[in-house]
Amino acid sequence: MNVGIFSRWNATCGVSLHAEMIGRELLRRGYPITVFAPYLESASRWWHHKLIRPDEEYVVRCYEELSPDGKEGKIDIEKVLEREIDFLIVESYEKLPYKDVEKLVKILKDKGIPSIAIIHEGDYEDIRYTDMNIFEKVCVFDERYVKEVLKDRVSEEKVEIIPYPCYPVREGSREFAEDGVIKFFSFGRQPKEEYCPYIEGLKVFKRDFPNVKYRIVRAMEPLKIFEDFVEQEERILDYEEIVKELHSADFHLLPKGNTKRVVVSSTLYQVLGTLTLTVVPDNRFFETLPHGEEAPVIFYRDVLELVKELKKASADEEYRKKIRENASKFVEENSVERITDRFENLINSILVKNVH
């Protein structure tokens, strides 16, 4: 079975990460895959979509995304059709060339090649398919996508809830503040203002815990922050570098501003398995995570609560241990292996149904 994946690929965004997690696990299991990705010129127009590694031999760059000025994208459909695939996974997101995706899915359907969509769009208005029932199944990460994003766009029996996957547990060996310094770390491309609660919170935290270091690695220009406890570097980190940085830190401060859209934080699912204590704002990105005694992260709602939680975690070893245990449990329950099992079973059930 050759699985086609229509998606961003090798890029710094949640769409690409999801496709890579599932795609590479299918590849590891012996399934050939073909990835149909956007042209590099098209992909690079969007600030959050930067390539992080060269393409593999199974990647075919064959479509233009919607342009920033609203111009409709397009697919070189012949490039797709000349590849032999038995099934197509569409990682659906708001910059897709929707008209051509529909056209492609219908052509494949007529050839007996079924397709499913995985919804990354966060708002009902973002989805611009004229008929989503062309897909055999429409997969979403949680119930919010059913109620707020899909609504009446697709028949209920076609919807499948499959959570966003986690990379496996890879615990580091660092003891908390083992060198006498409490080390904090952030990475990524988040807007500058989303770091403000952490900077302001650490200024207060330092009054009780003066030996603090906050390392920020961003893939764009450094923040205009001139605090002596802040160290900055401009660099795109690959996964192994991220893991190494987190294993050298005591806290991972994850900046995410709130939104009305339905969203998940792919960053969290990528790195929670390091078991470095992760701190997150209690907003839409993280609202489906367990809270209270089962929380796999440290939540905060404002700077005062952030400081309170950081002090508690720094002083209470049992609290830190509990958070890590919860994180490990969450990662195991949503491991990329388990989630790929779900997709593998779904794909096989659709193919068997189509044969009969």
UniProtKB/Swiss-Prot annotation:
<keyword id="KW-0808">Transferase</keyword>
<protein>
    <recommendedName>
        <fullName>GDP-mannose:di-myo-inositol-1,3'-phosphate beta-1,2-mannosyltransferase</fullName>
        <ecNumber>2.4.1.361</ecNumber>
    </recommendedName>
</protein>
<keyword id="KW-0328">Glycosyltransferase</keyword>
<keyword id="KW-0460">Magnesium</keyword>
<dbReference type="GO" id="GO:0016757">
    <property type="term" value="F:glycosyltransferase activity"/>
</dbReference>
<comment type="function">
    <text>Catalyzes the transfer of the mannosyl group from GDP-mannose to di-myo-inositol-1,3'-phosphate (DIP), producing mannosyl-di-myo-inositol phosphate (MDIP). Can also use MDIP as an acceptor of a second mannose residue, yielding di-mannosyl-di-myo-inositol phosphate (MMDIP).</text>
</comment>
<comment type="similarity">
    <text>Belongs to the MDIP synthase family.</text>
</comment>
